[in-house]
Regions:
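N-terminal strand-loop element at the rim of the active site
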Residues: 1-39, 206-208, 333
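Short hydrophobic beta-strand element within catalytic cores of glycosyltransferases
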Residues: 4-5, 265-269
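Carbohydrate-associated surface elements
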Residues: 119, 139
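A charged, aromatic-enriched C-terminal amphipathic alpha-helix characteristic of glycosyltransferases
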Residues: 144, 306-336
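A conserved mid-protein helix/loop that constitutes part of the nucleotide-sugar donor-binding site
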Residues: 166, 170-190, 200, 209
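Nucleotide-activated donor-binding/catalytic signature segment of Leloir-type glycosyltransferases, i.e.
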Residues: 212-228
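Aromatic "clamp/platform" in nucleotide-sugar-dependent glycosyltransferases that forms part
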Residues: 229, 248
Length: 336
């Protein structure tokens, strides 16, 4: 594998990922399409012209069909297998125009059509491409996420959280446009009225300024914890009692699989793709419902964590999200 990334932003590969790679990780940088489209396309063409002969497969992982240039260039310079892999089931305002337009032409340049879930497949493809689309589950190493009481106790001491405290939270980058974390703060401000001994925990990196100011505005700033980026996400989940995920849009969120692998009750919104594996997964509410109703829902599931690790492991595996079996299937598809 080699990685082709747009823009100069740093990308952090976990130590675990680096160990899995037999060879050093190779990252190629090309400019973003905007603001200078002409320059970007010139550099993109140069990259594919000079490197396409080394590649058997182009695997284009996308949140939307914002452009088809990678696929066009891969076809132009002779890469035989060209995979589009869709990871989102909705588009923001700008891409609501360009995405459906590119859907009409994606079949001209791609050879394989993948998606992380049925909803994402329906969003990315239509006609023949949708009929031929494959759903590729975002699989995980289940053992890393199974509930661990000792780790829970250790982390709660580290963050000065009592054992009887209700801890609600999520794992995600702090990105308001998609993740809707302001909604979490507003619901939590209602929750705290009903259960004073509560905390809201955000596990992930990003600019905290907006959310901290919002928490202060709602009078809960001393009850909200930002852990920053953590490499031990599987362990961090143990600190929670409820996984709260009211995103504006997603594909099929891998974090919902990870949360269920920890046995956590999940409370998410009813417009998102369904990722139900365990019975304590709840997506009955709408983002239009009152914050107090969401708070009541969280309280109703607070004690429903599934502690039977063997049951959880079996359920995740049977649902097709266990990494070893998924890896074998991916290898088969790459070699077709």
């Amino acid at each position: 594998f080699e990685f082709l990334l747009q823009g100069p932003e740093n990308v952090e590969f976990s130590d675990h990922f680096k160990k899995l790679c037999k060879n050093p990780i190779v990252v190629h940088r090309i400019p973003k399409l905007r603001p200078n489209i002409k320059l970007a396309l010139k550099e993109w063409d140069k990259f594919f012209r000079n490197n396409a002969h080394r590649y058997d497969i182009l695997w284009s992982n996308q949140n939307g069909l914002t452009h088809l240039e990678f696929l066009k260039l891969a076809k132009k310079y002779g890469i035989k297998k060209r995979i589009v892999h869709g990871h989102c089931a909705t588009a923001d305002k700008f891409y609501r125009f360009i995405h459906p337009l590119n859907r009409l032409f994606v079949g001209k340049y791609a050879t394989d059509f993948w998606a992380c879930g049925v909803e994402a497949a329906n969003h990315f493809y239509h006609g023949k491409e949708r009929k031929n689309a494959l759903v590729i589950n975002n699989a995980i190493e289940v053992e890393q996420f199974l509930y661990n009481e000792e780790v829970r106790e250790k982390l709660r001491k580290e963050y000065d959280i009592s054992e009887d405290c209700l801890v609600v939270g999520q794992v995600s980058r702090l990105y308001e446009k998609a993740k809707n974390q302001s909604f979490c703060v507003k619901v939590f401000s209602e929750l705290i009225k009903k259960e004073l001994n509560s905390r809201l925990v955000f596990i992930g990196k990003g600019d905290t300024t907006f959310l901290k100011n919002l928490a202060k505005e709602y009078g809960v700033e001393d009850k909200v914890i930002f852990t920053g980026l953590k490499s031990n996400v599987g362990e961090m989940l143990n600190i929670l009692d409820v996984f709260f995920f009211p995103s504006n849009f997603e594909g099929l969120p891998i974090v919902l699989v990870e949360a269920q692998a920890n046995g956590l009750p999940v409370v998410t919104a009813n417009h998102l793709p369904v990722a139900r594996i365990l019975e304590n997964y709840d997506n009955s509410l709408s983002l239009k419902d009152e914050f107090s109703i969401w708070a009541d829902k969280i309280l109703s599931v607070r004690n429903s964590r599934i502690l039977d690790r063997e049951k959880v492991y079996r359920k995740i595996t049977e649902s097709g999200y266990e990494i070893k079996s998924s890896t074998r299937e991916l290898e088969r598809l790459f070699n077709e």
